């Protein structure tokens, strides 16, 4: 029985979570009869059912199929948006990027890097931009940028370019616009996985 809840209230909340996680049909089953993924869902429900202000998870997405991992991420984001504080440990840096506001990378029992996710990603920016044009377009290196990669799909040409130091965003966009109609122009910030590797290695 979840602490501080009457039996009827506990059952009401549990059934609500079982419905949300699509496991209500397993309501009367014993835990040992469930698959590992189902057991993890039940463990998640038990953790959140009494609505604690602080939630702590250890590798919450480990072992889940992508669809179920996404389902749990969405539930964690909803809890966060309702004012719950969530702390979790993970080696899945993609989930850090999607879920976390703040993070800390711990290496050899010390904090190697910490801060707001968005701020740290901007701090590690490398001046890389994703660009696309309508139609078949050719780009060559120039004083404003270097071409890293290119591709063509449908009726669009895609490029990844590196901005030369001293070039402003407006100067870069202006130079790129000389070559055709820009469909997309945006800075590509490094992923949290990239930052993790740069901070502590593979």
Positions of PLM-derived features:
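Short, charged/small-residue-rich alpha-helical element at the C-terminal edge
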Residues: 129-202
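Conserved protein kinase catalytic domain
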Residues: 18, 73, 121, 193-197
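ABC transporter nucleotide-binding domains
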Residues: 1-107, 113
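ABC transporter nucleotide-binding domain
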Residues: 74-160
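A generic structural signal for secondary-structure junctions
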Residues: 43, 122-125, 200-201
């Amino acid at each position: 029985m979840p602490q501080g809840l009457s039996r009827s209230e506990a059952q009401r909340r549990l059934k609500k979570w079982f419905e949300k996680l699509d496991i209500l049909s397993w309501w009367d089953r014993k835990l040992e009869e469930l698959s590992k993924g189902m057991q993890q869902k039940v463990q998640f429900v038990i953790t959140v059912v009494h609505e604690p202000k602080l939630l702590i998870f250890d590798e919450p997405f480990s072992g889940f199929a992508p669809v179920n991992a996404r389902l749990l991420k969405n539930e964690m984001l909803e809890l966060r948006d309702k004012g719950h504080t969530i702390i979790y440990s993970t080696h899945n840096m993609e989930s850090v990027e999607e879920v976390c506001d703040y993070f800390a990378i711990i290496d050899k029992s010390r904090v190697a890097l910490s801060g707001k996710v968005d701020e740290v990603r901007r701090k590690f920016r490398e001046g890389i931009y994703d660009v696309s044009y309508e139609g078949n377009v050719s780009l060559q290196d120039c004083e404003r940028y270097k071409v890293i990669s290119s591709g063509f799909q449908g009726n669009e040409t895609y490029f990844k370019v590196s901005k030369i130091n001293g070039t402003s965003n407006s100067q870069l966009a202006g130079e790129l616009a000389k070559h055709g109609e820009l469909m997309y122009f945006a800075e590509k910030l490094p992923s949290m996985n990239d930052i993790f590797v740069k901070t502590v290695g593979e």
